[in-house]
Amino acid sequence: MPDDNENLAQSQSRLFRFVTLLSRHKVDFLVIGGQAEILMGGARVTFDTDLCYDRSPHNLERLASALAEINPSLRGAPAELPFKFDAQALAFGSNYTLVTDIGALDLLGWVEPIGDYNALQASAETHVVRQTPVRTIGLEDLIRIKEHINRPKDRDSLFQLIAIRAIRNEQRKKNTDDHV
């Protein structure tokens, strides 16, 4: 059975592959959920990748083109269910749970209680995975979402996210004090 370090390495490998693919296609997206929590310093194990994507027509075309390379299918749907995952399908829906050649992918066009990509990207952060910049949801937005969803695993995440916020605030205070 893999240990937490192996799970983290596999999780970051999947994330890196998704980020590389989408970046190559110039898709506008943010990493949200458990992967964002990990990039912020949280000790979380997650087996899927959650992304919020811009729903502009050009971005939907780029996203559909990128996803075509990794054979997306609807997670939990019967294999024989006909589904063509293209820009038009993306435009008709908003949130998708997918299985791909890389792994599980949740694509969210709308994230409660905040809104769409544009609302989230206003406070987005940049983290680095394997020397590659990765844009994530902002810490305060992630806390707000976890509070809103309020599942047991989200409540567990809240403890870590609030601790990360406290550490960041303390570091900011220390940096301010050092410059006074």
Residue ranges and their predicted role:
Residues 1-180:
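Compositionally biased terminal segments of proteins
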